[in-house]
Structures are given as structure tokens and as C-alpha cells.
Amino acid sequence: MQKIIHVDMDCFYAAVEMRDFPELRGKPIAVGGRSDRRGVISTCNYEARQFGVRSAMASGYALKLCPDLILVPGRMQVYKEVSSQIRAVFERYTYLIEPLSLDEAYLDVTDSPHCKGSATLIAEAIRADILAETGLTASAGIAPVKFLAKIASDLNKPNGQYVIRPDMINEFVKTLPLIKIPGVGKVTAKKLADLGLHTCSDVQAYPPAQLIERFGKFGTVLIERSKGVDKRGISPNRERKSVGVETTLAKDIHTLEQCRAVMPQLIQELGARVSRSAKDRTIHKQVVKIKFEDFKQTTIEHRSDDISVNLFYQLLEQAMERQHERGIRLLGVSVGLASNSSTTDDSDVDSSQLDLGF
């Protein structure tokens, strides 16, 4: 049985700013771009969240919700330096570390000799070390599998931790809302709700074959997660190459206008996912994916260093030139993330030639 810890810093960027600039403490602040430049919130503190401000929200809208919101420009180099300090703390307890972003990581402490092998005590020690050395608080989730550890880290925020023991899993997942499962966004949650599926117990009672037929590979993943199963191990060298969102349509659509109507929700969800899991990574391309009624698919991509709504619509128009009167059953958008060592090109490619990792 694995012992997995998911460590998540509390309001990381905002917390660093409040640490370095004490005059910001106790006030609603957000790290993000200026509203007059169509900026987006990267993160905000808890004072701002009380007004409904959230990550991936347009700065202009955030200011409408919270007129006293203080917008702070990001200092990425500082955040990276603090992240290195946090990583050094992790390495005292285990070498099996899978970073998800600058402020978040999975740790496998199954064979760690520290704290008498107790994952709970190791998590407490890690959080105490981080606080002592950086002045920042962290929350943690402890569980036998990755996705439950990630969920658990949210249950006692800020500056807390939550343990899901092996004997707790069955009861814990019964009432777990599906929206809490990593990979289930608003679009997928709506489709599941339309089937009467709201919690893991609902999925457990649903015919597996129908779920797999409707959701493909993700249907299999959903069935496993609903039972508390997650076969993934820690990947120390893991580097996410892309972040994407796609939707299988309730019925085939045929026109560009119909496709354009689907795009806003996809783009909004993509922005949220990038903010959650890749906010410290550099975007190098945008991609639109279409799957047709004959199950053949195509992708169009173009170089971009940010999420441009207009570019997504331009790529959609180009992809639709390959429709040839076929119905459209799936639409997807994604961004490619640059590796520290790789180079990219901006040529259009067909999905048969490139796995975009949707």
C-alpha cells in the first residue's frame, strides 16, 4: 500500500507578496495582469476570495466583485526561488517527488524512514519546515492513492492537513461529488449530471459499459476513481507537455456557428486548468481539435505565447475547412507547454502525426 502526500502551498504567489510586503496583509490582493490590458488573475488571498474573486478570472471582473482589490504584478523569479527552497525540504524526506507546479507536488513516502515511517507525521514535519524556512504555510493531504491525496489537501485549508486511511476509502468516496475528482471539469460534470450522476456512489451503480461507451477511456478512469482506485505512481521526471479541454457533444453539429457557440465554455475551462496546473509554465502554441461523425479527427495548431481567444476561433475556422460535410461529434482546445530544453515549430499538423495529450 502506497503512502502518498500531496502538498499544496496556501495562496502561494499572494502569500509571497504578503510576506515580502507586510502592508498588504489583511487586505484583498490578487496577483495578475492589469484590467486595462485584459489581464487574468493568477491567484488571490483569502480576503479576496470572500468577494468571489478566483484564479483564472479576468482582472476587470475581479475588480467589479471587489472594488478594493489590490492587483499585484507577478514576480516569477522570486516565486521560483521560493519553490526551490520548498523542493529542498521535500528532498529531506523522499526522493520520489512529482512536482505539479511551483507550489504543488506529490510525494511518495512509502519507504521513507523518517518519523517512524508515519506519512501523517512526515506531512506535519514538512509543513513545519516550510513555515520555518520560508515564512509560508502549506496544506497537505495524505492517502494511499494520488487523487485522494490531492482531494484531501483541500479539506483542511489553509495551514492544515487531512488523512484518508485505507479503511476510510470506501465510505469517503460514497458521498464524494464527481466535480471533486481531478479531470472532471464543469463540462464533464454537467454531462454526468444529465445522466443523474452526481457522486461516486452514483457512478458505482451505473452500468460500466454505458459509461465507457459515452466517455471512452475517461469512462474507465471514472469507474476506477469512484471506487477509490488510482493505479498511477509518482513520476519524478514528469513534465506536462500540454493542457487541454474537450467535449463530446450530445448530438452532432454541422456549422461553424454551432461550433463557435461551444467554444467559450471550453476556453474558459482551459484557462482555469492552466491556472491550476501550469501557471508557472510557458505556453508556446494553441491547438483546436475536431472529431467528426466518422471518428476521424484533425487538429490545427499555431505558435502563441498566451491564450488568445481570437486565435482559437481562427484555428477553428481552418479546421472546419477539413469538414467535408461531416457531422462534428467532439470539439477540443489545448495549449502546448514549452520544455526547458525543447524547441517547437508552428506548422499545422494532423492529429494522426502528433499526440497532443488531451
From Swiss-Prot:
EC numbers for this chain: 2.7.7.7
Key word Hydrolase present: no
Family: Belongs to the DNA polymerase type-Y family.
Keyword set includes Lipid biosynthesis: no
Transmembrane segments: none
InterPro entries in the cross-refs: DNA/RNA_pol_sf, DNA_pol_Y-fam_lit_finger_sf, DNA_pol_Y-fam_little_finger, DNA_polymerase-Y, DNApol_IV, IMS_HHH_1, Rev_trsase/Diguanyl_cyclase, UmuC
GO BP, sorted A to Z: DNA-templated DNA replication; error-prone translesion synthesis; SOS response
Reactions accelerated catalytically: DNA(n) + a 2'-deoxyribonucleoside 5'-triphosphate = DNA(n+1) + diphosphate
Residues that hold Mg(2+) according to the record: D8, D103
Protein name according to UniProt: DNA polymerase IV
Active site (catalytic residues): E104
Compartments where found: Cytoplasm
Domain UmuC stretches: 4-185
Molecular function via GO: damaged DNA binding; DNA-directed DNA polymerase activity; magnesium ion binding
Cofactor(s) listed in the protein's UniProt record: Mg(2+)
Root EC class: transferase
Keywords on record: Cytoplasm, DNA damage, DNA repair, DNA replication, DNA-binding, DNA-directed DNA polymerase, Magnesium, Metal-binding, Mutator protein, Nucleotidyltransferase, Transferase
Gene symbol of the encoding locus: dinB
Single GO cellular component term: cytosol
Co-factor binding details: Binds 2 magnesium ions per subunit.
PROSITE patterns: UMUC (PS50173)
Function: Poorly processive, error-prone DNA polymerase involved in untargeted mutagenesis. Copies undamaged DNA at stalled replication forks, which arise in vivo from mismatched or misaligned primer ends. These misaligned primers can be extended by PolIV. Exhibits no 3'-5' exonuclease (proofreading) activity. May be involved in translesional synthesis, in conjunction with the beta clamp from PolIII.
Pfam families the record matches: IMS, IMS_C, IMS_HHH_1
Site (described: Substrate discrimination): Y13
Known partners and oligomeric status: Monomer.
